[in-house]
Amino acid sequence: MKTKEKKDALSRLHIGGYGEAVMSRNFYSQSFNRYKKPENYANDHSHGRFDLPHVCLNFGYDFGQGWTMGSEIEFEHGGNGTAVEIEAEEAGEYEAEVEKGGEVNIEQFWINKEFWNGMFNIKAGEIIVPIGYSNVYHEPDQFFTVYRPEGEATIMPNTWHQVGISLWGRLKNWRYEAQLLSGLNSESFTAESFVHYGATSPYEFKVANNYAGALRIDNYSVMGLHIGLSGYYGYTFRNTLRTPGTKYDGLTGALGIIALDFSFNRWNWIIRGNVDYAHFSDADEISAYNQANWTHHRFQDGNPHHYSNIGSSAVAYAIEAGYNVFSQIPQMRQQNEQLFVFGRFEHYDTMASGTYESMYKYTKKYRCVFGLNYSPVKQITIKGEYSYRFFEKENNNGLTSDSPLYKQPYNNEPSVSLGITYCGKFL
């Protein structure tokens, strides 16, 4: 290959990525039973964590004539690892062990064809489902908190990606996108995470007995302001290898989601917000089905799905605002350094309505966050925050704590976190 051809090929290649390293200290119990009997865990010791929430590498290539390729490989929580060892204590038997928890995912892999200078595009492959703010803007420089915003990341898949077909484009100050996807799987829905795990598959393929559609429209007409409206609809029941009996013929598990989000970046302020609402039909019947069929055979274990109650609806809303105080210091402004002081409030509930709502009051969470984001250069941000997660107080109607009818309030959950992130293009 000639030198000129090599340079041309290299100019068509794009490499980038992002990553997060986090240290946190949680000043509340880490017991999985802390919501069942909160009085037993009120004085538990704090606990700390080190984590690599996301480390991603992006690769793209422009083939010419409007054809492009994009891919993203994501290592969640440092990836995973297994090893085979010979155990002396077990007569030299081979033993496979999980050396490290985590995940490795192909989060994106798509081919795109552009028409009419980007006014219309066709994209096919593993694509991001653009529902809500956090699925579209999931890089660490697009939110202030150390971890991704809790609300949307809890009630929906995040980052939500599936194999599908997308029609999208830009028209002046508008961007649109419509997608055809496989439906989610209601066997993976839970009380505490709603449909968060519904997009995953334990098999080597994604079952697509049901299909779903996603739509998003964005507007950029006002300088510094972006507004997005997105929606999703699809059936979720029977989207698995298992075939339910005829008594379930009328169930569809229809899932509808609507989300509104915005971001404002001007005058040294960044303000972001979102409102998300989801409704799930046949929640009671599918909850009963999941619990009655949590394993294929009474002597068989290892079912990858869940068998908890499911809410009929879920909700999440949030607002965050940050001001760049270095904008008022000439030397820092000239060096393009930034220091944002921010605050965030959010509420989310994975069991906002439904027959079992009273059993899962702890799913109704509120959270206040205050912190700093310091960027010495554009691609690197150091984050620090104090987070306070809390719950609605029980109405005990004047009962004292020694009464057998007294309902113990849930313990508040404060924490501090420190993180360092990078996000940018390398080539």
Show the residue positions of the predicted features.
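Surface-exposed loop/turn segments flanking beta-strands in extracellular/periplasmic regions
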Residues: 38-40, 144-151, 295-296
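Active-site glycine- and acidic-residue-rich loops that bind
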Residues: 158, 204-211, 250-254
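Loop-centered beta-sheet repeat module
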Residues: 188, 194-240
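Outer-membrane beta-barrel pore domains
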Residues: 28-30, 42-44, 94-99, 109, ...
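Outer membrane beta-barrel
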Residues: 10-27, 45-186, 209, 213-214, ...
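Active-site rim elements
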Residues: 97-98, 152-154, 200-204, 305-307
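Sec-dependent signal peptide cleavage junction
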Residues: 1-12
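Short Gly/aromatic-enriched secondary-structure transition segments
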Residues: 31-36, 166
